[in-house]
């Protein structure tokens, strides 16, 4: 159903009239494994950049942006409208940012709640919008950010910091960029990873690889098509119960040891036809063991996990899969942090896990406490360690 709808959108795009030479018009499609999770189309003229972004997770959300340009191509005003078409728990949002010299004013209306701010900005600041499944590459490409990178970055390890303006809030933050080659540029992802961008000879983005980020998405450039019309169709699927839903739902797994409850909370990512070990979950790197916040185990009585005694309380669980097929379970004294905030100085123990294989790929990541074993399973792997009351 999804692939048929997406194919029809691309075919329609190919039959549309091309824009005049003075304009730029294109689109980006973003995928998470087998699922298409975001679309963007944009048009640029000498005085204006206008685009639409549709995000499908957890439900269809349509974002419309407009940038007004001065004669030198700099942005004087940005407008962003966020409309939740198939995500009823998300508030609508209208944001206007006025840029004058070295300052900006932002007017944010979130479901009727107004907030106005004013702040200084750095020279050359550019608007950005991150959807949760990739950046707005139409904004970056249209505004020539990457043409500027080609001019100012030498190949190798040279980086440049460009001040950016979050179109959804008006806040500013520096973004780091690293040029790997004439056609490869890395964009900083919250200072924890890089998004790898492939450019053409003119400096336009043709693809973006977010596999090293927490989003794990791939984006590629395609012909312009009608994103708002596509959003209506996907919103109808949401209402019919046929949407994608949450990317990684939070799960509370309950087990019992000699009548005492043990609880594990974790985010459960989906396989989505991807190879997990070595790609989604890299070898040789500590993994949050799930998604979203750090995975946590809680018990009101002392436990023996493997051969290690843990006092009653809460602990975060991490894993370290290795190229040779072995896996270590890491128990950490911190808990409540996000899954990217691992701090090895709080580790209590690293212990080997028993490694097994499932007969067929498992779609949902899962953690369970059954028959005296704490098991972690996904795709074709299952890792286990003994667990008991002290």
Segments predicted by a language model, with ranges:
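Extended, well-structured beta-strand/loop surface patches
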Residues: 243, 265-312, 318-390
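Predominantly extracellular/luminal regions of secreted and cell-surface proteins
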Residues: 250-273
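Short, exposed beta-strand-loop hairpins at the edges of beta-sheets
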Residues: 205-212, 373-379
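Sec-dependent N-terminal signal peptides
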Residues: 4-13
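N-terminal mature ectodomain segment of secretory-pathway/periplasmic proteins
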Residues: 31-112, 176-182, 186-189, 203, ...
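Pro/Ala/Gly-rich low-complexity, hydrophilic intrinsically disordered segments
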Residues: 216-252
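Solvent-exposed helix/loop surface patches that form functional interfaces
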Residues: 92-184
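Tryptophan-anchored aromatic micro-motifs
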Residues: 22-36, 40, 158-164
């Amino acid at each position: 159903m999804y692939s048929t709808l997406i194919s029809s959108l691309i075919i329609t795009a190919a039959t549309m009239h091309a824009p005049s030479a003075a304009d730029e018009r294109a689109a980006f499609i973003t995928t998470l494994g087998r699922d298409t999770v975001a679309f963007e189309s944009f048009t640029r003229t000498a005085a204006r950049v206008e685009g639409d972004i549709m995000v499908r997770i957890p439900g269809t959300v349509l974002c419309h942006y407009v940038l007004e340009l001065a004669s030198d191509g700099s942005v004087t005003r940005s407008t962003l409208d966020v409309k939740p078409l198939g995500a009823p728990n998300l508030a609508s949002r209208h944001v206007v940012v006025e840029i004058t010299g070295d300052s900006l004013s932002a007017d944010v209306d979130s479901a009727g709640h107004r907030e106005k701010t004013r702040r200084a900005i750095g020279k050359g600041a550019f608007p950005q919008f991150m959807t949760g499944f990739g950046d707005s590459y139409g904004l970056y490409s249209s505004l020539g950010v990457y043409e500027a990178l080609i001019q100012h970055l030498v190949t190798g390890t040279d980086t440049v910091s460009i001040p950016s303006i979050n179109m959804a809030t008006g806040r500013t933050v520096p973004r780091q960029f690293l040029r790997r080659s004439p056609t490869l540029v890395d964009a900083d992802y919250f200072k924890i990873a890089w998004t790898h961008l492939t450019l053409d000879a003119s400096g336009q983005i043709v693809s973006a690889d977010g596999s090293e980020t927490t989003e794990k998405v791939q984006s590629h450039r395609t012909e312009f098509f009608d994103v708002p019309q596509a959003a209506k169709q996907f919103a109808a699927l949401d209402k019919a119960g046929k949407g994608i839903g949450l990317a990684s739902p939070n799960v509370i797994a309950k087990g019992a040891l000699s009548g005492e409850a043990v609880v594990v909370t974790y985010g459960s990512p989906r396989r989505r036809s991807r190879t997990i070990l070595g790609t989604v979950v890299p070898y040789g790197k500590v993994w949050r063991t799930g998604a979203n916040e750090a995975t946590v185990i809680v018990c009101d009585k002392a436990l023996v996990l493997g051969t290690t005694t843990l006092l009653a309380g809460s602990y975060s669980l991490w894993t370290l899969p290795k190229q040779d097929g072995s896996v270590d379970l890491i128990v950490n004294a911190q808990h409540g942090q996000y899954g990217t905030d691992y701090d090895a100085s709080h580790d209590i123990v690293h212990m080997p896990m028993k490694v097994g294989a499932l007969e067929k790929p498992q779609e949902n990541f899962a953690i369970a406490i059954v028959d005296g074993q704490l098991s972690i399973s996904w795709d074709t792997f299952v890792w286990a360690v003994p667990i008991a009351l002290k």
